[in-house]
């Protein structure tokens, strides 16, 4: 996945996870609450991966630009 895809998937998983967790708490369903918490955590990790990919890409582009400028 690209950084944008990772970020979007991460945000979606966070949102769905929060919703599941909230519904699970509201209806007293511990399994649904736990699934929601796990999905939210997965989303946070996906988003962090996307952020890291973006940072690496930006650093690579800056390095390439600096090298090309000095050639």
Curated annotation (Swiss-Prot):
Which first-to-last residue range defines the signal peptide? none
User: Matching Pfam families, A to Z?
Assistant: CsbD
In this chain, composition skew of type Basic and acidic residues spans 17-34
Annotated region Disordered: the residues are 1-42
**Covalent S-S links between cysteines:** none
Protein family membership: Belongs to the UPF0337 (CsbD) family.
Q: Supply the name of the protein.
A: UPF0337 protein mlr2098
